[in-house]
Amino acid sequence: MNIFVLDKDPMRAAMMMCDKHIPKMIIESAQMLSTVHRMLDGTPVKRRSKSGKTIQTYYTFGDIRDDLYYLAVHKYHPCTTWTAESLQNYNWHYYHFVSMAKEFKFRRGKEHITFKKLGPIIAAPPINIKDIGLTEFVQAMTHYPECMVPGDAVQAYRNYYHKAKPFAKWEWGREAPTWWKGYSGAEVHSETA
């Protein structure tokens, strides 16, 4: 679960993502955006898990939306929390989701099923979301603290790609971003490229 903020512009960030991340992150973004809708506009209901072993909190709308949105997952993940924090954060994340779906269509020649199902539904932000402006992007990479750059999520996520994503390839019609080219696998940068 993450939002790869490889650029401050959500479309450019999507264009810079490696081939493997495009289909995967469309699903993760849809999960986070759906979760934000459920948590902010839904009603919490406690009931047994599917296994029956635990009591869990579910969020219901009490209408057709219960069948449309994904179930709430990773409610307290930093990226989900960031998305729920403000209208502008939600909108940035939604436009990134749309941009990833466009990238998928560009690179693979077909529409991603998750976007087909949820794209129009999650376009409207939650009713109960705060309008406080775009907040600082979260850096969800605590397992790679050497990649983090205080106040610069873009550089941090580029560092993270370099350090943790050596598998990254751009073979489906998009060239690797300039900040990736020439990367040897050893360096992690502290300033924006």
Predicted regions: what is each one?
Residues 1-72, 76, 80-193:
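Sequence termini and other peripheral, non-core segments
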